[in-house]
Amino acid sequence: MQHARKKFRVGRTSAHNRCMLANMLKSLIHQERIETTLPKAKELRRHADKMITLAKKNTLAARRLAVARLMIRYNKLTSKEARQAKGGDLSVYNVDRKVINKLFDELGSRFVSRNGGYTRILKMQNRVGDNARKCIIEFLAN
């Protein structure tokens, strides 16, 4: 039975779920619209609304909490990122900084007068290969 189970479960480990949701949340903030499956979108909506609520506060503590929730690692590099950084490619840092700045500067100020419901889920046709329910999750215009 699924009584009192609120978490998203798709047969992955909890660490994999956390990383997947953090990456999807970064993509949603960066592009403001992503295409995914319906169960993932419903779970992502919960996290996105919490991040917008943090962005509306616009304090240093809120920024630090957002960095932690998005799993942004400014000081820890993987071996691939270290090779890119030695070559002068700092795009790894720039994208993460753009995501945080966009969250707090654009999205936080856009939804100041709104108390919740910052995202919308639009259902699409099922995927051809496995008949998965596809949808688009996006931030509202204002």
From Swiss-Prot:
Database matches in SUPFAM superfamilies: Prokaryotic ribosomal protein L17
Protein name: Large ribosomal subunit protein bL17
GO BP: translation
Quaternary context: Part of the 50S ribosomal subunit. Contacts protein L32.
GO molecular function: structural constituent of ribosome
Keyword flag Mitochondrion: no
Annotated organism of origin: Chlamydia abortus (strain DSM 27085 / S26/3) (Chlamydophila abortus)
The UniProt record lists the keyword Kinase: no
GO cellular component assignments: cytosolic large ribosomal subunit
InterPro entries xref list: Ribosomal_bL17 (IPR000456), Ribosomal_bL17_CS (IPR047859), Ribosomal_bL17_sf (IPR036373)
Family that this chain belongs to: Belongs to the bacterial ribosomal protein bL17 family.
Key words of the record: Ribonucleoprotein, Ribosomal protein
NCBIfam families, per database record: L17
